[in-house]
Structures are given as structure tokens and as C-alpha cells.
Regions:
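Charged catalytic cores and adjacent phosphate/nucleic-acid-binding surfaces used
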Residues: 17-18, 31, 36-39, 46-127
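Active-site gating loops and adjacent loop-to-helix segments of metal-dependent hydrolytic enzymes
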Residues: 1-15, 58
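Non-catalytic interface/targeting segments
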Residues: 22-26
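Alpha-helix N-cap/helix-start capping residues at coil-to-helix junctions, especially the first residue
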Residues: 1-5, 28, 126
Length: 127
């Protein structure tokens, strides 16, 4: 995989294979991120290949998350019909960017500080 700048110029190459299974549960990953002071947001949850919803049929009830990321072309209403439990979450729409032309742009929001709570509240305010 290559790392590029905003002009598409190659800055570096990543030699490690980044698409590989891990030996921890999603719940453990969530706890790990939370313990580091982060906000755990499962990505591409509706994606047919490796997505949480197509693989498990639902979000695990013991997964303590508020946000889920859905794919760029997802229709929110269609997803809510297929997976009604998604109404319990704040849904972010982002892109799985492999090429610069696929980049959707920045997700901008205002936070009342730099704490995790302020960032969380800022995200909620734009959804």
C-alpha cells in the first residue's frame, strides 16, 4: 500500500499487509480504545465484504458504542429498514478511500474543547 499526499504524490510505502484478522474480539478492541481515551467507531458496518452487519446480522448488544460508520453510498433509510437497531446509533457516512478522487472531503464540526466528551458532542451536533 502507498501513502500519498493531497496531490497524489507517493510519500511512502507500507510493506506490512494491513488486511489481516486479529486475535481479539470487537468488544476487547472497543475497551482498548476506550481505555486509551479514544472514541471507538466501527467502520463500514454495512459493507458486504467483512462488514459487521452482513457478518453477524446485528451489532453485538454488549458492544458499548454510540457511533457507527456506514459506507459512502449507503442509503440510511434502506439500512434502517433492514437493520432497525441502527436507529439506536449515530451514523457517520465516510468513504473507504483507496484513491484521492474517492475522498469525500473533511467532516467538520465544532467542539467546545478537546476532551472526548466535547468531540463526541460536536459529532452528535452535525448528525
Amino acid at each position: 500500500q502507498v501513502i500519498v499526499d493531497r496531490h497524489g504524490e507517493v510519500l511512502a510505502h507500507e510493506k506490512r499487509m494491513l488486511l489481516a484478522p486479529v486475535q481479539i474480539t470487537i468488544q476487547d478492541a472497543c475497551r482498548f480504545v476506550s481505555n486509551l481515551g479514544g472514541l471507538f467507531i466501527p467502520a463500514h458496518v454495512n459493507r458486504e465484504a467483512f462488514g459487521l452487519l452482513p457478518r453477524l446480522g446485528s451489532v453485538p448488544p454488549d458492544l458499548e458504542v454510540e457511533f457507527l460508520e456506514i459506507t459512502r453510498n449507503a442509503n440510511k433509510d434502506t439500512l434502517l429498514q433492514k437493520y432497525p437497531q441502527l436507529a439506536e446509533y449515530h451514523l457517520l457516512k465516510n468513504g473507504d478511500v483507496h484513491y484521492l478522487e474517492d475522498f469525500l472531503g473533511a467532516l467538520e464540526f465544532y467542539a467546545q474543547g478537546s476532551s472526548l466528551a466535547a468531540i463526541r458532542d460536536g459529532l452528535i451536533s452535525i448528525l
